[in-house]
């Protein structure tokens, strides 16, 4: 993507963090976050549950330093990796941009019928 959104550190509380992530998942931009090693597992779990499971994710550690490390892929595989290899140091997380939603008029009519609007032309 050609757009970046820098979000910095998200809230440490799970509910607040999930709300922030839900809003960030609506963006069509790569999201850049900071995270502490102690909260990385919780952040990755929340990314997965708030719509980021299909997005590419990169966990970058100790950028510009001797022990620089980048792990990328689906969030599910990153969760498994960091469950076995605890993160250390300064962490930057990148979440790839979401795909533009594609639907046609029949999809919209079906959704409106489901919520009881009864839209018809």
Residues of each region from the PLM?
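Class I SAM-dependent methyltransferase SAM-binding "motif I" and its flanking Rossmann-like core
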Residues: 1-27
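Small/polar loops that bind or transfer phosphate-bearing groups
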Residues: 8-9, 32-35
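A contiguous loop/helix-start segment that scaffolds small-molecule binding in enzyme catalytic cores
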Residues: 30, 37-121
């Amino acid at each position: 993507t050609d757009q970046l959104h820098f979000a910095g550190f998200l809230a440490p509380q799970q509910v607040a963090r999930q709300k922030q992530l839900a809003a960030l998942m609506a963006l069509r931009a790569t999201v850049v976050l900071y995270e502490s090693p102690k909260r990385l597992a919780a952040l990755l779990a929340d990314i997965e549950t708030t719509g980021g499971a299909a997005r590419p994710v990169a966990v970058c550690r100790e950028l510009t330093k001797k022990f620089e490390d980048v792990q990328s892929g689906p969030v599910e595989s990153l969760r498994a990796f960091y469950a076995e290899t605890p993160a250390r140091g300064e962490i930057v997380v990148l979440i790839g941009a979401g795909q533009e939603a594609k639907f046609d008029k029949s999809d919209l009519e079906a959704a409106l019928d489901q919520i009881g609007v009864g839209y018809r032309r």
